[in-house]
UniProtKB/Swiss-Prot annotation:
Keyword Nucleotide-binding: no
Residue positions binding Zn(2+) 1: H63, H65, H141, D212
Cofactor binding notes: Binds 2 Zn(2+) ions.
SUPFAM superfamilies assigned: Metallo-hydrolase/oxidoreductase (SSF56281)
Annotated residues for binding of Zn(2+) 2: D67, H68, D212, H270
Gene this chain is encoded by: rnz
Annotated organism of origin: Levilactobacillus brevis (strain ATCC 367 / BCRC 12310 / CIP 105137 / JCM 1170 / LMG 11437 / NCIMB 947 / NCTC 947)
Cofactor field: Zn(2+)
Sorted UniProt keywords: Endonuclease, Hydrolase, Metal-binding, Nuclease, tRNA processing, Zinc
Official protein name in the record: Ribonuclease Z
Family the UniProt entry places it in: Belongs to the RNase Z family.
Record-annotated active site: D67
Length: 317
């Protein structure tokens, strides 16, 4: 699981930062990529990465401001031109379907795949499969806006081979059955429950990706105990009143949220073009005074979301 930032700027494209788009690479977990927001020129940014549009099977839109959606029609079109034929699902506020369908109809664009739409009206679970759950919560922005919480389901515990050997259970295909937690009958008649030979379940990872927002209790629900929190930082320390008036957040507010909600790593994006070079470094320095594990990300930064294994005693290894 990796996060790749395709655009980390705010408002409009700049020399050093494109507008917002974030890729969650789940190639090992489900051989797919999920995008969060698709600002203008996102497909150009993708050309500078190893991402393949046909691998994108879900797009989560936080809100309908142009710097978060203007790249969507072009990306959908290019995915089709490049041979993508698998269905794609778009999640987002009411209106996202109309935006996409009108854009494609007016430009007479025909896609080689089906788009499914899930327009969000309430908070809660929006997707679940055998490996992941995704939750959405309303945020506090000038227009309807959502944040997303991606929860990986727990992994089965590791097979305790030493215990199996001590119990004189011979190795072979039976180990695979026991690893799956199945109950098996051995040739000598013994009935073995696989669950008795598994270590503690390994907790899945949690990533929270927020859209534009002022401080709100719903952000806490999304962020709590996250391995990684992606949070906007449109304004700097000392600009909280300005941030509130524009329905945005400061770097300090994001850091305070991360600290309060026991987040492991905070990644700040949606950086205004006002902050370049030393000023961007100062944004990071200010936030780290509150929450040390903070990073101001740049376009094309890749962040691995580590998988923390538990020992037999249930403590981090």
């Amino acid at each position: 699981m990796e996060i790749e930032f395709l655009g980390t700027g705010a408002g409009s494209p700049g020399k050093f930062r494109n507008v917002t788009s974030t890729a969650l690479r789940l190639l090992d977990e489900r051989n797919s990529v999920w995008l969060f927001d698709v600002g203008e020129a996102t497909q150009h940014q993708i050309l500078r990465t190893t991402l393949k549009p046909r691998k994108i099977d879900k797009i989560f839109i936080t809100h309908l401001h142009g710097d978060h959606i203007f790249g969507l029609p072009g990306l959908l079109s290019s995915r089709s031109f490049q041979g993508g034929d698998a269905p794609l699902t778009i999640y987002g506020p009411k209106g996202i379907r109309n935006f996409v369908e009108v854009s494609l109809r007016v430009s007479e664009t025909k896609l080689s795949y089906k788009i499914r739409y899930q327009e969000l009206t309430t908070d809660g679970l929006v997707f679940e499969d055998g490996k992941f759950r995704v939750y959405a919560q309303h945020l506090d922005h000038r227009i309807e806006c959502f944040g997303y919480r991606i929860e990986e389901k727990d992994h089965p515990g590791e097979l305790q081979v030493e215990q199996l050997q001590a119990a004189k259970i011979p190795s072979g295909p039976v180990y695979g059955q026991l690893k799956a937690g199945k109950t098996v009958t051995l040739p000598d008649g013994r009935v073995i429950n696989g669950a008795d030979f598994l270590g503690p379940a390994q907790p899945g990872r949690i990533v929270a990706i927020l859209g534009d927002t002022r401080q709100t209790p719903n952000a806490e629900k999304l962020a709590i105990n996250a391995d990684v929190l992606v949070h906007e930082s449109t304004f700097a320390k000392g600009e909280s009143k300005l941030a509130r008036s524009y329905y945005h957040s400061t770097n300090i507010q994001a850091a305070e949220l991360a600290k309060r909600m026991h987040v492991k790593q905070l990644l700040l994006n949606h950086i205004s073009a006002r902050y370049t070079g030393k000023m961007a470094a100062e944004l990071q320095h200010q936030a780290r005074e509150v929450f040390k594990q903070t990073r101001v990300v740049k376009d094309f930064d890749e962040i691995e979301v580590p998988f923390e294994k538990l020992t037999k005693e249930g403590t981090p290894s």
